């Protein structure tokens, strides 16, 4: 069954897409709909707010990361059990990854994704400082690309009743229906930092209150019936299936611990789904305050903002030691960006896990963009020469030890011949954010390594002298016992890693 969608776009960043999209998700849910939320592009932060509003995981649709052919199946997978989808766009409507020649349509734009799905676009226009000019703006966006259908406009930050009247007249002149008019209000402002909004998990209770405020404002000022009436989709793809994606894998029991909590909030829902499909039990733990779950066979350290919590991460020396010992035993450890920073010897002078020899520091230099990466060496995840498109998103720098083995070399239009990350034994750590659906073999390979390289390493260490064994006591225990588990985190991040059973945020 096809599930209709609307894509919420804007002429430019800063127009209020996230506010309107999140409020629309919440208002539709409040009206009795089951809403599937999506974000165009690789962004991890906005889906956290979407998840709070929808009560189910926020997901990403990025044809640059996963390719055009997977957008329809990932959409079909994400809308399962829903009756409508809201897709928040990225940047301006036609903005995306610009090709080396320029001039061609940008890949991964909101218009690109909307066209792939046959979804109509609702344009959010920041009305501050303009009135009749809105007609020219809407005319241009409506006629620029025949593959993009603008079904209506939501006017944001409207100054007064008179201002709204003039704006509506301008929209009529352009032939674009007005679906809502949002007044200027400070209650919808969300805190930001250098990489966008403060994450919903970090913002905590205030994030939930902000989502409630967005929901109330959209419910009051947007014609939901008109939004539903204009929704549509031409996508008729079979849903992406993680079981089919990972293929045949080892089925012996294995526990994969995924870092969560305030410091590790960047992750795609499909990652945990693929690990489960490969036969793993996925358990969250918070490195700020918890230890590894008993029986942990492998660790995933996703992205986030560890530089905001360096002292707290360093203070939990028990879990740092456990991760170090697990890695020393040959267990698979997959770390992206924040995970890499957590694995090095120190971050801004604070001791970290010491798994990767090197030090990291916060800088003022933003590294942001897609990367065409080539695997430099065989690892628990990739084969040498394997090509992956990923995303870099940080303001830190790592100085590796001279003897390190890099994970990737970046090639292509944005950066060329730049080496990133480190690989040794079962550890694969780098700045590169990847989408698991684009490289499903990795999930199975990572899972299989739990039962091969790890068990072999622990057996060898058991035979070693006590001075060596003392450093891997937890790792050996992890193989022998798989009974008790630490409590699952009670946080909105559970929605982001798709823990068993969709549930509303607490």
Task: Name these PLM-found stretches.
Residues 254-316, 321-326:
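Phosphate-binding active sites in nucleotide-utilizing proteins
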Residues 39-40, 178-186, 281-288:
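Beta-strand->loop->alpha-helix junctions that form or flank phosphate-binding loops
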Residues 131-248:
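Internal gly/pro-rich beta-alpha loop/helix module
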Residues 250-252, 265-274, 281, 368-372, ...:
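C-terminal and late-domain segments of enzyme folds
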Residues 2-19, 25-117, 125-152, 161-165:
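ATP-dependent carboxylate-amine ligase catalytic core
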Residues 306-381:
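Cysteine-nucleophile active-site neighborhood
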Residues 458-462, 466-477, 491-493:
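N-terminal amphipathic/hydrophobic targeting modules at extreme N-termini
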Residues 460, 487, 492, 498, ...:
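Intrinsically disordered, low-complexity proline-rich tandem-repeat tracts
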């Amino acid at each position: 069954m096809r599930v209709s969608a609307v894509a919420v776009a804007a002429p430019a960043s800063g127009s209020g897409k996230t506010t309107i999209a999140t409020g629309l998700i919440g208002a539709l849910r409040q009206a009795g709909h089951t809403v599937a939320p999506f974000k165009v592009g690789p962004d991890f932060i906005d889906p956290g707010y979407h998840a709070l509003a929808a009560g189910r995981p926020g997901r990403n649709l990025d044809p640059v990361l996963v390719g055009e052919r997977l957008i329809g199946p990932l959409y079909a997978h994400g809308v399962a059990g829903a009756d409508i989808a809201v897709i928040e766009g990225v940047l301006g409507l036609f903005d995306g990854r610009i090709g080396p020649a320029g001039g061609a349509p940008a890949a991964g734009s909101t218009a690109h994704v909307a066209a792939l799905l046959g979804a109509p676009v609702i344009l959010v226009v920041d009305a501050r400082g303009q009135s009749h000019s809105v007609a020219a703006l809407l005319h241009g966006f409506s006629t620029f690309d025949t593959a993009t259908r603008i079904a209506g406009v939501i006017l944001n930050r409207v100054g007064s009743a008179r201002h709204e009247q003039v704006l509506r007249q301008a929209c009529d002149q352009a032939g674009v229906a007005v679906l809502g008019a949002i007044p200027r209000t400070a209650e919808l402002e969300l805190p930001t930092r250098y990489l966008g909004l403060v994450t919903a998990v970090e913002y905590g209770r205030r994030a939930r209150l902000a989502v409630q405020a967005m929901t109330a404002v959209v419910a009051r000022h947007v014609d939901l019936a008109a939004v539903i009436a204009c929704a549509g989709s031409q996508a008729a793809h079979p849903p992406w299936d993680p079981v089919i994606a990972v293929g045949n894998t080892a089925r012996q029991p294995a526990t994969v611990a995924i870092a969560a909590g305030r410091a590790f909030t960047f992750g795609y829902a499909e990652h945990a789904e693929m690990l489960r499909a490969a036969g793993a039990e996925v358990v969250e733990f918070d490195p700020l305050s918890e230890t590894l779950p008993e029986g942990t066979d492998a660790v995933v350290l996703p992205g986030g903002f560890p530089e905001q919590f360096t002292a707290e991460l360093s203070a939990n020396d028990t879990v740092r030691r456990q991760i170090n010992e697990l890695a020393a035993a040959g267990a698979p450890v997959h770390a992206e960006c924040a995970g890499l920073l957590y694995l090095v010897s120190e971050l801004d002078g604070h001791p970290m896990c010491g798994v990767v020899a090197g030090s990291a520091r916060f800088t003022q230099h933003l590294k942001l963009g897609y990367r065409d990466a080539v695997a430099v060496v065989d690892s628990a995840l990739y084969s040498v020469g394997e090509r992956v498109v990923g995303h870099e998103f940080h303001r830190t720098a790592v100085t590796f030890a001279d003897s390190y083995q890099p994970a990737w070399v970046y090639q292509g239009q944005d950066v060329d011949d730049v080496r990133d990350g480190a690989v040794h034994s079962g550890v694969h750590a780098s700045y590169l954010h990847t989408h698991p659906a684009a490289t499903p073999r990795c999930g199975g390979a990572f899972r299989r390594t739990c039962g091969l390289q790890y068990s072999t390493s622990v057996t060898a260490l058991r035979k070693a002298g006590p001075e060596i064994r003392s450093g891997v006591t937890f790792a050996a225990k992890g193989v022998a016992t798989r009974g008790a588990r630490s409590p699952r985190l009670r946080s909105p991040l559970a929605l982001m890693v798709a823990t068993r059973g969709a549930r509303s945020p607490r």
